[in-house]
Amino acid sequence: TGLKIETLPDKSLNANGPGRTDHGNFVLNDVRMYATDQEKFDAKKHRITLSGARADFTQTGWPAKNAIDGKINEGKKGTGWAVGPQYGKAHQLILTTSKPVAIKGSTRLQVVLDQQYGSKHTIGCFRISARTGQSPGDGISQQIVKILTIEAGERDDKQAEALFNLFRS
């Protein structure tokens, strides 16, 4: 189980986004998830631990795993996930929970996207989906999962082409 966060291009954003900067980038510093069947959320009691992160593309120095490392400092002192220089394109971040989440009746989910890299490095258009299932790689081949664990700048041409073909499909 986990979350899928899709950042989406939009004509209303500079460079078609998906971020709000002039060039379309964003920095997602931290993602937190909470679940409860009660009316109010207790940050300590209802927090769901996110233990895995991967993305279809990561900016050098800003990998997917940084979106769940808990470091929420502002600007370059912080960490996060970013997608430069692939602006104007849809991207996805898949987060997995450390253990399955038991859903009973009407469970409320709260997802917090923390974005502290200046005033414009925020996501302009996005979609969040809750994921269920046993495999964190549902819908993504093991070859692609393995490639996504490699920093973008360290991938060879064949690996980059495999990701491009997946993205294009």
Residue ranges and their predicted role:
Residues 6-9, 112-121:
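Short beta-strand-plus-loop segments that form exposed binding edges in beta-rich domains
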Residues 4-6, 30-34, 127-129:
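Beta-strand signatures of extracellular beta-sandwich domains
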Residues 8, 34-105, 150, 163:
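Disordered, acidic Ser/Thr/Pro-rich linker "stalks" and the adjacent N-terminal cap
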Residues 8-12, 134-136:
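Acidic glycine-/aspartate-rich tracts in secreted/extracellular proteins
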Residues 17-26, 118-127:
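Extracellular carbohydrate recognition
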Residues 40-49, 115-116, 122, 127, ...:
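Substrate/cofactor-recognition hotspot
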Residues 29, 93, 109, 126:
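Residue-level detector of short, conserved catalytic/binding motifs and their immediate flanks
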Residues 1-5, 102-113:
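Noncatalytic modules at the cell exterior or secretory-pathway interfaces
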